[in-house]
Amino acid sequence: MANYFNTLNLRQQLAQLGKCRFMARDEFADGASYLQGKKVVIVGCGAQGLNQGLNMRDSGLDISYALRKEAIAEKRASWRKATENGFKVGTYEELIPQADLVVNLTPDKQHSDVVRSVQPLMKDGAALGYSHGFNIVEVGEQIRKDITVVMVAPKCPGTEVREEYKRGFGVPTLIAVHPENDPKGEGMAIAKAWAAATGGHRAGVLESSFVAEVKSDLMGEQTILCGMLQAGSLLCFDKLVAEGTDPAYAEKLIQFGWETITEALKQGGITLMMDRLSNPAKLRAYALSEQLKEIMAPLFQKHMDDIISGEFSSGMMADWANDDKKLLTWREETGKTAFETAPQYEGKIGEQEYFDKGVLMIAMVKAGVELAFETMVASGIIEESAYYESLHELPLIANTIARKRLYEMNVVISDTAEYGNYLFSYACVPLLKEFMTTLQTGDLGTAIAEGAVDNAQLRDVNEAIRSHAIEQVGKKLRGYMTDMKRIAVAG
């Protein structure tokens, strides 16, 4: 099979990369009704599989789970989760032939095997759903022409999909129809109903393409979302300890610092995150972020280039075929780092202390978010898609580090994200080695001393922060989410 994106001509590639439209709330007036009375069979019962299924059932849909025979016979975790939540469970042969919509929510590396197993069993005119388009775009999976292929991609981990639904809301979601597989022209109706059934329409839905979702998703997770957090954690910890900081304190400052810093990011973007600093610290964080952007720009561009060309995917799929040798080696090495093995700090660190003593971390977040966004947009991805795949998801990933350090992050994210994370972080750490030797007192681990600030310089820095394109689109999208949340609660 050929990489689907690489079979397109340049005009088609640009059109699909640039497909992105924020959908109006009234486009979802029919809710999930298009799928009511139809049989929806989910393949896979991991975090996305279970939680999307719970939401869809609560929205009135007929949901069951198709699992492999051995998973049922051995009563594996997927079987236990589905049965304990009261779902009907059966083999592919028992459930797929009756399905109107088959939703493939297994890990990326299993998609080809799953699709090849279920496709011959699917009835004529059925639909096949994904929550990530890797199998279609990068693997180039060929789907029967009578089958409609759609995607509903919540921009959050599966647990968040469920928790937001229970609160009467949802999570921002991308939907798409594969242009090669929409024989009856009903793909968008199916995708909209599925998104509504998960609650996504209450938080904002972008009509996108399989191509735009995959290329932007891969870029975000490799760079700012996972790779930058991992590289930053290792670099900052080693720097603090080398300067004489207690390893336990250093570990806590970093482990919980990302979450604290990005909570401000979630509420008010880079502007609010920077506003949490004193004026001297803000000026220093800005200067550091500009240095970091200049150093790291070629690395971000290389990752985007390799994603666009398919080089990244072919390398990762070669590792799949080699029993994940690289992935497992990198995972083991990460687990042995000084940051991961440091003792826990029993003392308390106040919220503002994370900002005051984490100026470098804030600079890394700012530089990474802006670089990821700028690099995606320069490659033809629309700003709204680039925002969701950079700034929006960062607090969610930072939260996983707060739970159990880098181990937890790498367990929670997909194997695809984990592989890309290691590629980036293994390149980024040595790239920033010299930069780390230029840090000043107050950049990390101690607060910057109060001092005189040049008004004109502060004015210009504030303007530069607020006028960045990601701040403009972020303010708009966060406003949509806030407005929709008010409507959802009122309703």
Curated annotation (Swiss-Prot):
It comes from the Bacteria. GO terms for molecular function: ketol-acid reductoisomerase activity; magnesium ion binding. Substrate binds at S414. Its cofactor is Mg(2+). The active site is at H132. Mg(2+) 1 binds at D217, E221. Residues 15-208 form the KARI N-terminal Rossmann domain. It is an enzyme of class 1 (oxidoreductase). Gene3D superfamilies: N-(1-d-carboxylethyl)-l-norvaline Dehydrogenase, domain 2, NAD(P)-binding Rossmann-like Domain. This is Ketol-acid reductoisomerase (NADP(+)). The lineage of its organism: Bacteria, Pseudomonadati, Pseudomonadota, Gammaproteobacteria, Enterobacterales. The gene is ilvC.
